[in-house]
Protein backbone atom coordinates (compact mmCIF):
# COMPACT_ATOMS: atom_id res chain seq x y z
CA UNK A 1 0.00 0.00 0.00
CA UNK A 2 1.02 3.59 -0.69
CA UNK A 3 -1.07 4.91 2.18
CA UNK A 4 -4.09 4.44 4.40
CA UNK A 5 -7.39 6.31 4.56
CA UNK A 6 -9.38 6.86 7.74
CA UNK A 7 -12.17 4.77 6.21
CA UNK A 8 -12.71 2.84 2.97
CA UNK A 9 -14.83 4.53 0.30
CA UNK A 10 -17.56 2.15 -0.86
CA UNK A 11 -18.92 2.22 -4.39
CA UNK A 12 -22.44 3.60 -4.68
CA UNK A 13 -24.81 3.97 -7.58
CA UNK A 14 -24.26 7.07 -9.76
CA UNK A 15 -27.56 8.77 -8.84
CA UNK A 16 -26.86 8.46 -5.10
CA UNK A 17 -23.37 9.90 -5.61
CA UNK A 18 -24.67 12.80 -7.70
CA UNK A 19 -27.38 13.59 -5.12
CA UNK A 20 -25.30 13.23 -1.97
CA UNK A 21 -21.72 13.81 -3.05
CA UNK A 22 -18.78 11.46 -3.34
CA UNK A 23 -15.94 10.93 -0.87
CA UNK A 24 -13.78 9.78 -3.78
CA UNK A 25 -14.54 12.97 -5.75
CA UNK A 26 -13.77 14.97 -2.59
CA UNK A 27 -10.37 13.26 -2.35
CA UNK A 28 -9.56 13.90 -6.01
CA UNK A 29 -10.64 17.54 -5.70
CA UNK A 30 -8.43 17.95 -2.61
CA UNK A 31 -5.48 16.52 -4.54
CA UNK A 32 -6.15 18.86 -7.47
CA UNK A 33 -6.49 21.92 -5.21
CA UNK A 34 -3.21 21.16 -3.45
CA UNK A 35 -1.38 20.46 -6.72
CA UNK A 36 -2.70 23.57 -8.48
CA UNK A 37 -3.26 26.21 -5.81
CA UNK A 38 -6.56 27.04 -7.54
CA UNK A 39 -9.55 28.63 -5.80
CA UNK A 40 -11.96 25.82 -6.72
CA UNK A 41 -11.84 22.38 -8.32
CA UNK A 42 -14.01 19.94 -10.19
CA UNK A 43 -13.69 16.30 -11.06
CA UNK A 44 -15.83 13.53 -12.46
CA UNK A 45 -16.00 9.81 -11.85
CA UNK A 46 -15.92 7.02 -14.40
CA UNK A 47 -19.03 5.20 -15.53
CA UNK A 48 -17.98 2.26 -13.37
CA UNK A 49 -17.45 3.40 -9.79
CA UNK A 50 -15.41 0.93 -7.73
CA UNK A 51 -14.76 0.46 -4.03
CA UNK A 52 -11.74 2.43 -2.83
CA UNK A 53 -10.02 0.46 -0.06
CA UNK A 54 -8.77 1.84 3.24
CA UNK A 55 -5.29 0.52 2.42
CA UNK A 56 -4.64 2.43 -0.79
CA UNK A 57 -2.66 0.81 -3.60
CA UNK A 58 -1.57 2.19 -6.95
CA UNK A 59 -3.90 -0.32 -8.59
CA UNK A 60 -6.86 1.03 -6.56
CA UNK A 61 -6.01 4.59 -7.59
CA UNK A 62 -5.77 3.68 -11.28
CA UNK A 63 -9.03 1.70 -11.06
CA UNK A 64 -10.80 4.61 -9.37
CA UNK A 65 -9.41 7.30 -11.69
CA UNK A 66 -9.07 5.48 -14.99
CA UNK A 67 -8.71 8.56 -17.21
CA UNK A 68 -5.21 9.46 -18.51
CA UNK A 69 -5.93 13.15 -17.87
CA UNK A 70 -3.64 15.94 -16.77
CA UNK A 71 -4.49 18.96 -14.65
CA UNK A 72 -5.20 22.44 -15.97
CA UNK A 73 -6.12 25.62 -14.14
CA UNK A 74 -8.29 28.16 -15.95
CA UNK A 75 -9.81 31.51 -15.01
CA UNK A 76 -13.62 31.47 -14.87
CA UNK A 77 -16.41 33.97 -14.38
CA UNK A 78 -19.72 33.47 -12.63
CA UNK A 79 -21.37 33.18 -16.08
CA UNK A 80 -19.03 30.32 -17.03
CA UNK A 81 -19.63 28.56 -13.70
CA UNK A 82 -23.38 28.96 -14.09
CA UNK A 83 -23.29 27.43 -17.58
CA UNK A 84 -21.15 24.53 -16.34
CA UNK A 85 -23.34 23.92 -13.30
CA UNK A 86 -26.46 23.98 -15.47
CA UNK A 87 -24.88 21.33 -17.71
CA UNK A 88 -24.10 19.16 -14.68
CA UNK A 89 -27.56 19.70 -13.19
CA UNK A 90 -29.12 18.51 -16.46
CA UNK A 91 -28.02 15.05 -15.21
CA UNK A 92 -31.15 15.00 -13.05
CA UNK A 93 -34.68 14.34 -14.28
CA UNK A 94 -37.91 13.04 -12.82
CA UNK A 95 -39.51 9.68 -13.54
CA UNK A 96 -43.25 9.48 -14.32
CA UNK A 97 -43.88 8.62 -10.65
CA UNK A 98 -42.15 11.85 -9.58
CA UNK A 99 -38.99 10.23 -8.24
CA UNK A 100 -35.59 11.69 -9.06
CA UNK A 101 -33.74 9.84 -11.82
CA UNK A 102 -30.90 10.27 -14.29
CA UNK A 103 -31.75 12.10 -17.49
CA UNK A 104 -31.88 9.96 -20.63
CA UNK A 105 -29.39 12.37 -22.24
CA UNK A 106 -26.74 10.91 -19.90
CA UNK A 107 -27.82 7.31 -20.58
CA UNK A 108 -28.49 7.20 -24.34
CA UNK A 109 -27.09 6.65 -26.90
CA UNK A 110 -24.15 5.99 -24.54
CA UNK A 111 -23.82 6.08 -20.76
CA UNK A 112 -22.12 9.31 -19.67
CA UNK A 113 -21.94 9.39 -15.87
CA UNK A 114 -18.43 10.79 -16.38
CA UNK A 115 -20.02 14.02 -17.64
CA UNK A 116 -21.50 14.82 -14.22
CA UNK A 117 -19.05 17.05 -12.34
CA UNK A 118 -18.36 17.28 -8.61
CA UNK A 119 -17.22 20.74 -7.49
CA UNK A 120 -15.17 21.67 -4.44
CA UNK A 121 -14.89 25.18 -2.99
CA UNK A 122 -18.39 26.35 -3.91
CA UNK A 123 -21.75 26.04 -2.22
CA UNK A 124 -24.40 25.75 -4.91
CA UNK A 125 -28.15 25.93 -4.40
CA UNK A 126 -30.27 24.52 -7.22
CA UNK A 127 -33.95 23.93 -7.87
CA UNK A 128 -34.26 20.71 -9.84
CA UNK A 129 -37.96 21.36 -10.46
CA UNK A 130 -37.01 24.22 -12.76
CA UNK A 131 -36.32 23.60 -16.46
CA UNK A 132 -32.81 22.63 -17.50
CA UNK A 133 -30.82 25.83 -17.94
CA UNK A 134 -32.64 27.65 -15.12
CA UNK A 135 -31.84 25.48 -12.11
CA UNK A 136 -28.94 27.34 -10.45
CA UNK A 137 -30.26 29.59 -7.68
CA UNK A 138 -27.09 30.56 -5.82
CA UNK A 139 -23.31 30.20 -6.10
CA UNK A 140 -21.50 30.96 -2.85
CA UNK A 141 -17.71 31.26 -2.58
CA UNK A 142 -16.06 31.76 0.81
CA UNK A 143 -19.38 32.50 2.49
CA UNK A 144 -20.58 35.15 0.02
CA UNK A 145 -22.65 35.08 -3.13
CA UNK A 146 -20.21 35.13 -6.05
CA UNK A 147 -20.48 38.51 -7.81
CA UNK A 148 -20.88 38.63 -11.58
CA UNK A 149 -17.60 40.54 -11.98
CA UNK A 150 -15.40 38.27 -9.83
CA UNK A 151 -13.21 35.63 -11.44
CA UNK A 152 -11.89 32.47 -9.83
CA UNK A 153 -9.22 29.97 -10.76
CA UNK A 154 -10.67 26.51 -11.43
CA UNK A 155 -8.59 23.34 -11.67
CA UNK A 156 -10.00 20.56 -13.80
CA UNK A 157 -8.78 17.85 -16.11
CA UNK A 158 -7.61 18.67 -19.62
CA UNK A 159 -10.52 16.72 -21.15
CA UNK A 160 -13.10 18.93 -19.45
CA UNK A 161 -11.06 22.11 -20.03
CA UNK A 162 -11.22 21.37 -23.77
CA UNK A 163 -15.01 21.75 -23.59
CA UNK A 164 -15.69 18.03 -23.97
CA UNK A 165 -18.84 16.48 -22.56
CA UNK A 166 -21.07 19.44 -23.31
CA UNK A 167 -18.94 21.96 -21.41
CA UNK A 168 -18.08 24.31 -24.27
CA UNK A 169 -18.23 27.18 -21.77
CA UNK A 170 -14.65 26.35 -20.72
CA UNK A 171 -13.10 26.52 -24.20
CA UNK A 172 -12.53 30.28 -24.20
CA UNK A 173 -11.35 30.54 -20.57
CA UNK A 174 -7.77 31.75 -20.12
CA UNK A 175 -5.29 29.03 -19.16
CA UNK A 176 -3.51 29.93 -15.90
CA UNK A 177 -1.32 26.84 -15.49
CA UNK A 178 -0.94 23.22 -16.49
CA UNK A 179 0.61 20.13 -14.89
CA UNK A 180 1.62 17.39 -17.29
CA UNK A 181 1.56 14.72 -14.56
CA UNK A 182 -1.46 12.44 -14.87
CA UNK A 183 -4.06 13.04 -12.17
CA UNK A 184 -3.85 9.40 -11.00
CA UNK A 185 -0.13 9.99 -10.35
CA UNK A 186 -0.96 13.18 -8.43
CA UNK A 187 -3.37 11.15 -6.27
CA UNK A 188 -0.63 8.57 -5.61
CA UNK A 189 1.84 11.31 -4.62
CA UNK A 190 -0.77 12.93 -2.36
CA UNK A 191 -1.57 9.66 -0.56
CA UNK A 192 2.16 8.95 -0.10
CA UNK A 193 2.71 12.40 1.42
CA UNK A 194 -0.37 12.37 3.65
CA UNK A 195 -0.53 8.76 4.79
Task: Label each residue range with its predicted role.
Residues 2-23:
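Glycine-rich phosphate/diphosphate-binding loops and the adjacent beta-loop-alpha structural elements
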Residues 26-195:
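Feature captures C-terminal
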Amino acid sequence: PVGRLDVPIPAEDPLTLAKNGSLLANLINQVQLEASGADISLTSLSNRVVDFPQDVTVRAIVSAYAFPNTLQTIRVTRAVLTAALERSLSYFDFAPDGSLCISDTFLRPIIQHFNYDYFSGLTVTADLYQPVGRRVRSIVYQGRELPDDQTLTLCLNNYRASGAGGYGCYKSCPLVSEKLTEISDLVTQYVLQHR
